[in-house]
Regions:
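Membrane-interfacial helix-loop connectors
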Residues: 51-102, 165
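Transmembrane alpha-helical segments and their short flanking loops
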Residues: 32, 36, 61, 99-100, ...
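Conserved helix-loop functional segments at active or binding sites
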Residues: 12, 29-32, 36, 46, ...
Length: 166
């Protein structure tokens, strides 16, 4: 604790803050350049950003859009990635042979439907690698499609089914 606390506050915290600010600037520029490309990239990398806690770099962009335009397009790229991760884990149920692993699928799918994909990522798809890659591809396709169709979010809501009304 005497070592971890100062290292966390003095080294890791500032590095993550710098990375988050750089990502936010890059994402903002990409969104202005090509919304479809933005949706593709955000959808593809969303789960990786979640793993490293860098997904918070998109929230200020969405808040700024909501405040100035009344809607946010920055949220659409990440929305489909959550469902892609959930679908990949649900599909794993039919491929898994180990009953202990199969028992993890239902709780991960339920939490994924509600917008919390960490159990699906860390418990099932990341250890198997292929489902994680397929969920990234699905997230990219859905992110590009949703931004191409002009999907907007009018309020800050969660991911998953509870975010659909927003």
């Amino acid at each position: 604790l005497l070592i971890a606390l100062p290292v966390g506050f003095l080294v890791i915290g500032p590095v993550i803050t710098i990375l988050t600010n750089m990502l936010a600037t890059g994402f903002d520029s990409l969104l202005a350049f090509s919304p479809i490309l933005f949706g593709l990239i955000v959808g593809f990398f969303w789960q990786v950003l979640v793993m490293f806690g860098l997904h918070w770099s998109l929230i200020p962009i969405a808040i700024l859009q909501l405040g100035t335009m009344g809607y946010a397009t920055a949220l659409t790229g990440m929305f489909g990635a959550s469902f892609a991760q959930t679908a990949a884990v649900a599909a794993m149920y039919f491929r898994l042979k180990n009953p202990k692993e199969k028992a993890l699928v239902l709780p991960a799918v339920i939490s994924g439907i509600c917008g919390v994909t960490e159990p699906a990522i860390y418990g099932l798809s990341l250890p198997k690698k292929k489902p994680f890659v397929f969920s990234m591809i699905g997230g990219a396709v859905s992110g590009a499609f949703m931004t191409a169709m002009g999907v907007r979010s009018y309020v800050m809501g969660g991911l998953g089914v509870f975010g659909i009304p927003s």
